[in-house]
Design a protein with these regions (language model features):
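Bacterial N-terminal signal peptides that target proteins for export
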Residues: 1-6
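C-terminal motif of bacterial Sec signal peptides marking the signal peptidase cleavage site
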Residues: 15-18
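Non-transmembrane, membrane-proximal soluble domains of secreted or membrane proteins
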Residues: 20-43, 63-263, 268-282, 297-336, ...
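Alpha-helical transmembrane segments
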Residues: 41-67
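Hydrophobic aliphatic residues
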Residues: 290-291, 323, 357
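Helix-loop element at the rim of GNAT/NAT acetyltransferase active sites that forms part
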Residues: 359-364
């Protein structure tokens, strides 16, 4: 009974792995290059399935026809060695099949790898365990980025985007299946990836290369806006963060940020207590417009949650839980040298810090303003 159960269990695992109704589905492309990949892979999968069935049938036939009929039957089955027609047939047919697959594969790879003119250039940095996006709006990658954000790649619809995928620590792999294939993020190398989204929407992805304890939690997310909304997003995200009024909880939270957070995080327009610019270590996400994002912490947790009326409400409790003890929510390196450590913030410091962070707008268009902002 057990020997019968194990093959069934293995088959069930394979069938479950093939379910394509998740958000990360390569068979429902929403981008030009992803559609080209799907156009290539479907006939290849069909051809592979047909070949697999033919091989299985032939193997079954040989096993049945060539078996020994009795225990004392010493005769060998009929041998085909030296049969010129048979050997030419089973050599040429696989060669033609490989040619049938290779030609469109090579042409598709060359097509999706070409960089269109006037594409928006964005540097994509992978690091344990989140993605950073740096926008070069002028197209000159040698100049400082105009916009630096994290966790959400915001792009306009029907526009060519040139991604320069890189890593600041170990090897990662950037993948948003609805828009294109995967591209490894390798330290010291710049890997190009071209995307173009056909529809306004939000598309999920993830790191596809094992990169440490929280690899499974290293999400990627693309937010595709209309061209008008994208221009508004650009103008808003080019601005520095506003300074909170003196004597407010937000101002007290800014002081906590400078004392506890500014060695890793950056907020444009914020100076350290000594008057020097906050360290641009890039070890942690740029928080200048945190409230404009719908997710945080490796895009793992929602920063905004829908209420019964369909409006978005600030997820203050989740953000406070994250600040209270990050390693309790996401696996980090045991020596706290990777990921966000537990800073041992007091509850009063957490309240003040969140009061400041919720001022880092703008907020999503259908969101209810946080009570403290």
């Amino acid at each position: 009974m057990r020997t019968r159960f194990l093959p069934l269990l293995g088959a069930a695992v394979l069938l479950i792995a093939g379910c394509g109704q998740t958000k990360q589905d390569v068979f429902h492309p929403e981008g030009t290059n992803a559609d080209k990949i799907n156009t290539l892979q479907v006939p290849v999968f069909i051809a592979a399935g047909v070949v697999g069935v033919i091989v299985a049938v032939m193997l079954g036939y040989v096993m049945v026809a060539g078996r020994r009929r009795a225990a004392n039957d010493e005769r060998d089955p009929e041998q085909l060695h030296g049969n010129f027609k048979a050997e030419i047939t089973w050599t040429l047919i696989p060669a033609l099949i490989l040619l049938f697959v290779a030609v469109p594969t090579v042409t598709t790879m060359l097509d999706i790898s070409s960089t269109p003119k006037d594409a928006i250039s964005i540097d994509v940095y992978g690091q344990q365990w989140w993605w950073s996006y740096e926008y070069h709006l002028s197209g000159n990658e040698s100049t400082p980025a105009d916009i630096v954000t994290a966790n959400e790649l915001v792009i306009p619809v029907d526009t060519d985007i040139h991604l320069r995928v890189q890593s600041r620590d170990v090897i990662h792999s950037f993948w948003i299946p609805a828009l294109n294939g995967t591209r490894d993020a390798v330290p010291g190398r710049i890997q190009p990836l071209e995307i173009r989204a056909d529809k306004v929407g939000e598309y999920d992805g993830q790191c596809k290369e094992f990169c440490g304890l929280s690899h499974a939690n290293m999400r990627a997310r693309a937010v595709v806006l209309s061209k008008d909304d994208y221009e508004k997003w650009v103008e808003a995200n080019k601005a520095d963060a506003a300074t909170p009024a003196a004597g407010t909880d937000a101002a007290a939270g800014l002081a906590v940020f400078k004392a506890k957070c500014s060695s890793c995080h950056q907020i444009n327009g914020v100076d350290q207590v000594e008057g020097k610019s906050a360290l641009v270590s890039k070890h942690a996400p740029n928080l200048t417009h945190l409230m404009d994002r719908k997710v945080f912490a490796s895009a793992q947790f929602p920063l905004w949650v829908p209420n019964a009326d369909g409006k978005l409400e600030f997820n203050r409790n989740q953000l406070e839980a994250w600040l209270r003890d990050p390693p309790a929510l996401l696996a980090m390196a045991p020596d706290q040298k990777r990921g966000m450590p537990n800073l041992a913030l007091s509850e009063d410091d957490i309240d003040k810090l969140v009061s400041y962070l919720e001022t880092l707008g703008p907020i999503p268009s259908n969101a209810i303003p946080p009570s403290g902002s």
